[in-house]
Amino acid sequence: MSVLLIAEHNNKELRPFTLNAATAASQIDADVHAVIIGQNCGDAAKALSELPLVKKVIHVEAPYYENFVAENFAPVIVKLAENYSHIVSSANTFGKNLMPRIAALLDTSQISD
């Protein structure tokens, strides 16, 4: 099964942590799909689609995703989760806030650094 990468960005460009997470995801499986969630983040989505390790980009946009609130992001990821063997995110404040919520909603444990 494919790996789902959660892209981190500022609605304009990808954050460098996303590149690190993409490399980690590709070590699990070569079929890496990425989800980018935000508002007016088309440029970041385009940059994500140009990463050689990413095979597919899922672009989700709405005004309530603009401020990167984990409580808004988690349900989106959970809906996508059944199609993936692993979900990968950066190991910073963004990922450490979001991933436990996703794990709880999926009734599973997470592996973190």
Model regions: which residues?
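N-terminal glycine-rich FAD/FM-binding segment characteristic of electron-transfer flavoproteins
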Residues: 1-113
